Amino acid sequence: MAPTKPSFQQDPSRRERITAQHPLPNQSECRKIYRYDGIYCESTYQNLQALRKEKSRDAARSRRGKENFEFYELAKLLPLPAAITSQLDKASIIRLTISYLKMRDFANQGDPPWNLRMEGPPPNTSVKVIGAQRRRSPSALAIEVFEAHLGSHILQSLDGFVFALNQEGKFLYISETVSIYLGLSQVELTGSSVFDYVHPGDHVEMAEQLGMKLPPGRGLLSQGTAEDGASSASSSSQSETPEPVESTSPSLLTTDNTLERSFFIRMKSTLTKRGVHIKSSGYKVIHITGRLRLRVSLSHGRTVPSQIMGLVVVAHALPPPTINEVRIDCHMFVTRVNMDLNIIYCENRISDYMDLTPVDIVGKRCYHFIHAEDVEGIRHSHLDLLNKGQCVTKYYRWMQKNGGYIWIQSSATIAINAKNANEKNIIWVNYLLSNPEYKDTPMDIAQLPHLPEKTSESSETSDSESDSKDTSGITEDNENSKSDEKGNQSENSEDPEPDRKKSGNACDNDMNCNDDGHSSSNPDSRDSDDSFEHSDFENPKAGEDGFGALGAMQIKVERYVESESDLRLQNCESLTSDSAKDSDSAGEAGAQASSKHQKRKKRRKRQKGGSASRRRLSSASSPGGLDAGLVEPPRLLSSPNSASVLKIKTEISEPINFDNDSSIWNYPPNREISRNESPYSMTKPPSSEHFPSPQGGGGGGGGGGGLHVAIPDSVLTPPGADGAAARKTQFGASATAALAPVASDPLSPPLSASPRDKHPGNGGGGGGGGGGAGGGGPSASNSLLYTGDLEALQRLQAGNVVLPLVHRVTGTLAATSTAAQRVYTTGTIRYAPAEVTLAMQSNLLPNAHAVNFVDVNSPGFGLDPKTPMEMLYHHVHRLNMSGPFGGAVSAASLTQMPAGNVFTTAEGLFSTLPFPVYSNGIHAAQTLERKED
C-alpha cells in the first residue's frame, strides 16, 4: 500500500509555497475548491470578475460592430450625399429613415399619387431586350444625366425652399436650400416638429392651417409669449405638441379653395442679426404658400371623409426690414404709409404708370384706392403686417382716377426711426403687374368725371329712366303687332289741350328735353322727371362750351309713347315759347297722320342731329319747320363741326353683371363699355371702312372725353351720312377695348413697350395702336433703341456678359416702327436674397465680366458716346442684365463689384427717393460689413 500524500494542514512548507504563488489579502475572500487531491485555493474573486468583464466587453464590442455596420448600411440607402451620411449618428439615421419611409407613403398614398413614372420595365420583357433598348435609345444617356440633377436645379432656381409636413406637423422632407435662407441644417430639421422652429405666437395659426387642434391652454400660452420676441419655441414639451383634428366635414375638404394655403409665419434663423427684426429677434418672416394633401379614397361613396395627410409648402423668406435696401426695379413705385395705411409719401414714378400723381394720393388711406372686392384681402395683410412686421399682399386692383384699375402686388415692411423708437411707419413697395384695364369705366363714385352738377344729374337721370322700362330700343324694328296697337291707342286717345296746361312751366324752362318715354303710372319716372326738368336747362350751353368731353356721354334710349305724360315731354322738346305752344296741336295732328316708318325715321334723325339739330327744330314757330326737319336728314350732318357734337342713339340691352338699382353702376359710360366688351355684343363697327389709327386730340369717339360708343346697324343714317357715322365707331384709348391698326393682326394686338399706355398728350387716342405712342406721330419713348443697338447686343453676348432678353424686332431694327411688338417682364416681388457665401465659396462664382457704366460708355465698348446714362440704365434693365439680388452702391463713385453680372449706378439717378438706392446685384462682402457698422 502506497504511502498517502501529506495533507495541506500537515505540510507547512507546501502551504507557504501556495501562499507565495497566490497571495491571500483577506481570508474571507478566499474560495476553497475541493479537488481529488485535497483542498486548495486557486484564484480570487477579483480575478474571476476581470475575466468575466473582459469576455463581456468582447461580446459587446462584436455586437456593436455588427450594429454599426447595419446602421451605416442603412445610412447608405438614404437619399443623401455620402459626405453627410458618414457623419450621422444612430439616432439621426433612424430619424431620417423613418421620415424617408413616411415620405414614400406620403407620395404614393396621397391624392394624386406622385409615382406616375414606372420604376421597372414592363412585364414579360426579357433582360436582353431591356439591354438592347437601352443601347438603341439615343437619348437614354442625356435623360439620365439631365434627370440626375433635375431636382437640384429646380431647387436652386426657386427663390426659397421646399418642405412637406405630415398631419402631426413633422418635417417629412425639407430641401437643403433652407440653410441659405435660415441657416438651419436639413438633417437637423428632417423628422423634427415644425413647432420647435416656429415662433410661439404663430403656433395657433400654424395648427389651424394644418387642420390641427392645440391642447387646452396651448393657445393662451402662445399668445402670452408672442409679445416676448426673445422667447424660444424649442422649450415646449412633447406633451404640448398639437394633435391632429378629426375631419368632421368631408365636404369642406373636397373643394380646391379649402386646400390652398397662403400665410405668414416666423421661423428660427441663425442668419438674422440682433436688432434687425422688430417683432421678434432671431426669427425671419416666411411666406408659406402650399396645398393640403389628402389620402386617396379607395371607396367610391361620398360619405367617406377625406383624411388630411399633410401639407406641401414652398417657403419664401422676406427681406430684412431695413429701409436702405429697397431695390429699384422697372414697373414699381414706393410709398410710405403710417400704421393705419394713411399715405404720407409717394414717388413721382407713379405718374408714369397711372393717371394719378403724388398729390392725388398723399393724405389718403390705401383703402381709398383698392377695389371693393380686394379690401378684405388687404385687411388680412394689414393684420399680418401689424403682428409680424412684414407681409406680401395678394394680387389686388388699384383704382385709377378716370376709371378702371391696375393689378398690383405690394410688399410692406415696418420701419422704426433710429432716433425715436416710438415713430413707426411702413415702407409700401408696389409692383405693377398689368396694363390699365377697363379704362374710362367708372367703378367707384370717386372715378366719376368732374362734370357740372346739373348735367351729371341729367345724364344719370336719363339712364335710370331707361332702366325703368321693360322694353328697349333694340326691339324697335322687330316689335309685334300688339305693341303697335298699344302705341296707336295711346297716341289717338291723348288730348293736347290739357297737356299745354299741365306742362306750361316745364316748357318755359326746358330747352332740351328727354326723348325717352315715361309711364305716368310709374312713381320713379315722375320723380326723375322733376330732376330732369331742373337740370336740362343748361345743356345747350354745356354742349357749346365743352361738348368734346360731354357729347358722347349723353346717351339717349328711345322707346314708344305709352301715355299722355310721355307725349307731353315730346311736345315740350320742340316748343320753346308761348307762341310755339299754339302750334302744338297742329304738330301733333301732322305726327298722327304720318306713318309708323316716318316716326321711326324721326327718332333716328333726332338722335343723330344732337343738340345742334334740336336748336334748329326748336327755332321753328310753325309745324312746317318740324315737317322740314323730318324730310331732310342729310342736311343736319353736312358740317363736320356739327357732326362732332352729335348725340348718339344707341340700342341698350340689359346691362351685364351690373345692378340695375345702383346709380353708380347705371352710369352711361359703364353700361356702354360693358355692353361693347361682352361676348354677346349687339353692336358692331361698319364693315365698309377700316378703323383709322387714333390721331389728334379731338379725333372721333367723343374727343377727350374718353367714352367711345359704337353705333348699331339698325340705327345708322342713310348712305349720305355714313362717313360721319363711321368716324364715331373707332375704338379709342382704352387698352382693353382698343383694336390694332390695319397693318397689325386684329386677333393678336401687339404688346406695348411698357405695361402702361402712353400719355394722352402725345395724341387724342394714345395707345390705340397697342405698342406705339399716342396719336399718329413717331413714338418719343422708342428711343430705348439707341445708336448701334444691335451691335451692342452682339458685343454683350460675345463677351459672356449676359444673355439679353429676347424680343421681336420688326423690319431692320424697328427704329422707325411705332407699333413694334415687344416682350416685357413685369415687376415681381423680390424675396430675401440667399446667402451666397453659404451656398458656394467666393472662388466658385461664375466667371463673367462685370460691366461698369463708365466702361460701357467708353469708345472701346462700341456704343454711342452720346448715349444718356439714364437711357442706358433703363435699357440694361429691359435686357434683364442685372443680377438677381441687391448690391450696395457707393455714392462717391461707381464701384465695380467682385462678383460677375453686377451693374452699379450712382444714387444721383434717383434723387427723388429720401433713402439710398440699391441696384440689382449680388451682395458683396464690404456691403455686409458696412451694414453691420
Curated annotation (Swiss-Prot):
Pfam families xrefs: bHLH_HIF1A (PF23171), PAS (PF00989), PAS_3 (PF08447)
* Chain intervals with Gly residues compositional bias: 695-707, 761-778
Is Ion transport there in the keyword field?
no
Q: Superkingdom of this entry's organism?
A: Eukaryota
Principal localisation:
nucleus
UniProt keyword terms in alphabetical order: Chromosomal rearrangement, DNA-binding, Nucleus, Repeat, Transcription, Transcription regulation
- Residue ranges, annotated region (DNA-binding): 53-64
- Per its record, how is this protein called by name? Neuronal PAS domain-containing protein 3
Instruction: Please report the organism this UniProt entry assigns to the protein.
Output: Homo sapiens (Human)
Where is the organism placed in the taxonomic lineage, from the top? Eukaryota, Metazoa, Chordata, Craniata, Vertebrata
What's the encoding gene here?
NPAS3
